[in-house]
């Protein structure tokens, strides 16, 4: 667990079910236009069905996408799937201000998920050869980050209660035959609402933040400054 970040708060925004592209653009805009005084943010979101290709993604790992769109992403890693019932958490932290290294952040994210699952009675672990969190040999959480101007964005995708079939259409994270699992298969009846507060609490504990301050989310708040009307707020929060 990191030293407590006394001087900086973190804002929590709940987005609900959203298409991938506009949320991704909003996240990029926030990162591009944030200032030294902008609070760090975490966004909880479920995405409509989409495959995303990371920067290292290879076309041969997209086997048969069918009617699910494939979108290029600038996060690290290979191809993965997002869909309803999967908890995505975008993590936008000023690493320079927090005096936090990228490896430290990755470890904190993995430990966040491991702690969340432990709270639900599920034993899991990280693997040095393949980022993410695993239950036995099955992957339950993917992660991918990008750092720009010393600030992180993108984050984690935790399988909670979803249709896992689309993972069969790809080589998840570039691994042929990688088996996926989810919380509801290991603890029946677990819902997104059960998981969200535990996940947020574990994350703030790992990074040493005070409790997250929940604020509403609106796409209009994350337009570039020159595209905002005078009545809209700036990207800085």
UniProtKB/Swiss-Prot annotation:
Q: Which organism is it from?
A: Yersinia enterocolitica serotype O:8 / biotype 1B (strain NCTC 13174 / 8081)
Q: Which keywords describe this protein according to UniProt?
A: Acyltransferase, Cytoplasm, Transferase
Q: What does this protein do?
A: Catalyzes the transfer of endogenously produced octanoic acid from octanoyl-acyl-carrier-protein onto the lipoyl domains of lipoate-dependent enzymes. Lipoyl-ACP can also act as a substrate although octanoyl-ACP is likely to be the physiological substrate.
Would you name any one GO CC term?
A: cytoplasm
- Any Gene Ontology biological process: protein modification process
Site Lowers pKa of active site Cys — annotated at: 139
Q: In which pathway does it act?
A: Protein modification; protein lipoylation via endogenous pathway; protein N(6)-(lipoyl)lysine from octanoyl-[acyl-carrier-protein]: step 1/2
Which GO terms label this protein's molecular function in UniProt? lipoyl(octanoyl) transferase activity
Q: What class of enzyme is it?
A: transferase
Residue stretches making up the BPL/LPL catalytic domain: 36-211
Q: Does the keyword Transferase apply?
A: yes
Q: Which domain of life is it from?
A: Bacteria
InterPro entries for the chain = aa-tRNA-synth_II/BPL/LPL (IPR045864), BPL_LPL_catalytic (IPR004143), Octanoyltransferase (IPR000544), Octanoyltransferase_CS (IPR020605)
Xref: PROSITE patterns: BPL_LPL_CATALYTIC, LIPB
The EC number(s) this enzyme carries: 2.3.1.181
Q: What is this protein called?
A: Octanoyltransferase
Q: Where is the active site?
A: 173
- Record: residues binding substrate: 75-82, 142-144, 155-157
């Amino acid at each position: 667990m990191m030293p407590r970040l006394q001087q900086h708060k973190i804002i929590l925004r709940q987005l609900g079910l959203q298409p991938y592209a506009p949320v991704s653009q909003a996240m990029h805009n926030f990162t591009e236009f944030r200032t030294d005084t902008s609070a760090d943010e975490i966004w909880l979101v479920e995405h409509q069905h989409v495959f995303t290709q990371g920067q290292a993604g290879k076309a041969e790992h997209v086997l048969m996408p069918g009617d699910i769109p494939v979108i290029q992403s600038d996060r690290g890693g290979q191809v993965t799937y997002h869909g309803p019932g999967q908890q995505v958490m975008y993590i936008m932290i000023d690493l320079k201000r927090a005096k936090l290294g990228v490896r430290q952040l990755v470890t904190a994210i993995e430990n966040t998920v491991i702690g969340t699952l432990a709270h639900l009675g599920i034993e899991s672990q990280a693997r040095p050869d393949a980022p993410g969190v695993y239950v036995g040999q099955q992957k339950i959480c993917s992660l991918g980050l990008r750092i720009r101007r010393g600030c992180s964005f993108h984050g984690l995708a935790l399988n909670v209660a979803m249709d896992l079939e689309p993972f069969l259409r790809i080589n998840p994270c570039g691994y042929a035959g990688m088996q996926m699992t989810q919380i509801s298969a290991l603890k029946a009846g677990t819902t997104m609402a059960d998981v969200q507060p535990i996940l947020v609490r574990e994350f703030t504990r790992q990074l040493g933040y005070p409790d997250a301050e929940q604020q509403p989310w609106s796409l209009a708040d994350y337009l570039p400054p020159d595209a905002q009307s005078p009545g809209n707020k700036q990207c800085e929060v």
